[in-house]
């Protein structure tokens, strides 16, 4: 095996794609700033107990671990930047009011999410801390839509969920709550026969609980699903509150294509309120995901309501049309002071100037040189090619 081969599910990013990704990164961070979000940059590696504080087992399984040669303690390479940003808000900034933070950085997964996914992601996202009302959720959803619009996506679909529905059903039946992890997995896979078999095998799960859990995978579709859920599910306060929270979001966004999937409870042990996933044509799974996670900052000694979202910029860029080649100016290489001044002036004006080194022809695929610097009547001037 060649020494140049990369590990499985990792890849180099070549110039055209790297340029597209960097352009997106700059544009999106500038967009987030217009909303009042402040940029933070947590470290790539942290002590594992800090990195996983307040998160579920899913993040633990996705985290690559190593031993710190200075302290002997276990380190983790971040698989998600959100807990780090939560730590910054709760422990370092320690502000009393609303805080808006955004971020962009590399994350590494121990295993790919699926056969088509990479283990290395360039995660970008935004979080609002300090406001428990649905106004913060609406601002995050508006920013999500502006994010994909800035990338050129049209007519995306937002699917909403709320883990409070499942949580209320399980809390009302201790026998079912004992199998919470199994039930969550079966719901995410929409495995109705598996849910029925679990209830039959245990015997202690109440019939109404089993029926409600088996009904959940079928409760997906348009906003009218909420009305069906009120009819099909137990009249528990927690269920009603979760459905009301979803309805409030739907009522506030009449011009957005919204769906509801009450079994899409990824991050069940992490999220506390309305969650969402954004889908768009050209991507095989969710492009953006996020939601409310009010309990995570408690692990850092300061409970703060929180909601936010994140996406993988590499994944976003791969689904976009190929970027056009940038236009550039071709110039000779030389030590002439007037030539150097002309090149410097063009670059300061934002032009790309590629100087051909001696003995080489222009061969870069990244640029189209449609003009060149030529010496004419003793002065360096631009000529159209």
Curated annotation (Swiss-Prot):
Pathway involvement?
A: Amino-acid biosynthesis; L-histidine biosynthesis; L-histidine from 5-phospho-alpha-D-ribose 1-diphosphate: step 1/9
Q: What's in the keyword line of the UniProt record?
A: Amino-acid biosynthesis, Cytoplasm, Histidine biosynthesis
GO BP of this protein: histidyl-tRNA aminoacylation; L-histidine biosynthetic process
Give the highest taxon in the source lineage: Bacteria
Q: Between which residues do disulfide bridges form? A: none
- Keyword Lipid metabolism assigned to the entry: answer is no
Give any GO molecular function from the UniProt entry.
Answer: histidine-tRNA ligase activity
Its subcellular locations are: Cytoplasm
Where is it found, in Gene Ontology cellular component terms? cytoplasm
Quote the subunit structure annotation. Heteromultimer composed of HisG and HisZ subunits.
Q: What else is known?
A: This function is generally fulfilled by the C-terminal part of HisG, which is missing in some bacteria such as this one.
Q: What is the protein's known function?
A: Required for the first step of histidine biosynthesis. May allow the feedback regulation of ATP phosphoribosyltransferase activity by histidine.
Q: Which family does it belong to?
A: Belongs to the class-II aminoacyl-tRNA synthetase family. HisZ subfamily.
> HAMAP family annotated for this entry?
HisZ (MF_00125)
Tell me the protein's name: ATP phosphoribosyltransferase regulatory subunit
Species: Bordetella petrii (strain ATCC BAA-461 / DSM 12804 / CCUG 43448)
């Amino acid at each position: 095996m060649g020494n140049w081969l990369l590990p499985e599910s990792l890849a180099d990013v070549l110039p055209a794609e790297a340029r597209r990704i960097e352009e997106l990164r700059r544009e999106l961070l500038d967009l987030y700033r217009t909303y009042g979000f402040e940029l933070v940059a947590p470290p790539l590696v942290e002590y594992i107990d800090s990195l996983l504080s307040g998160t579920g087992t899913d993040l633990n399984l996705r985290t690559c671990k190593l031993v710190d040669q200075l302290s002997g303690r276990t380190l983790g390479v971040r698989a998600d930047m959100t807990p780090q940003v939560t730590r910054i808000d709760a422990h370092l900034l320690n502000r009393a009011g609303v805080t808006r933070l955004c971020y962009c950085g590399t994350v590494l997964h121990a295993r790919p999410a699926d056969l088509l996914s990479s283990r290395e992601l360039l995660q970008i996202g935004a979080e609002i801390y300090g406001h428990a009302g649905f106004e913060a959720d609406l601002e995050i959803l508006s920013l999500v839509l502006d994010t994909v619009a800035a990338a050129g996506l049209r007519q995306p679909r937002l699917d909403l969920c709320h883990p409070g529905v499942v949580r209320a059903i399980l809390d009302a039946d201790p026998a079912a709550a004992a199998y919470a992890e199994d039930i969550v997995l079966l719901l995410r896979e929409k495995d109705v026969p598996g849910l029925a078999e679990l209830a039959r095998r245990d015997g202690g799960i109440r019939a109404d609980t089993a029926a409600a859990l088996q009904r959940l995978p079928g409760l997906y579709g348009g906003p009218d699903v909420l009305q069906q859920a009120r009819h099909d599910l137990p009249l528990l306060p927690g269920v009603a509150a979760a459905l009301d929270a979803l309805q409030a979001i739907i009522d506030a966004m009449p011009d957005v294509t919204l769906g509801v999937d009450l079994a899409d409870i990824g991050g069940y042990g992490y999220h506390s309120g309305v969650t969402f996933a954004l889908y768009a044509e050209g991507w095989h799974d969710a492009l953006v995901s996020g939601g409310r996670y009010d309990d995570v900052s408690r692990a850092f000694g300061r409970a703060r309501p929180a909601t936010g979202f994140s996406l993988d910029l590499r994944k976003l860029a791969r689904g976009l049309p190929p970027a056009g080649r940038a236009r550039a100016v071709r110039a000779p290489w030389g030590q002439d002071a007037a030539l150097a001044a002309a090149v410097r002036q063009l670059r300061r004006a934002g032009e790309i100037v590629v100087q051909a080194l001696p003995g080489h022809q222009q061969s870069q695929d990244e640029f189209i040189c449609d003009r060149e610097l030529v010496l004419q009547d003793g002065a360096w001037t631009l000529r159209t090619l």
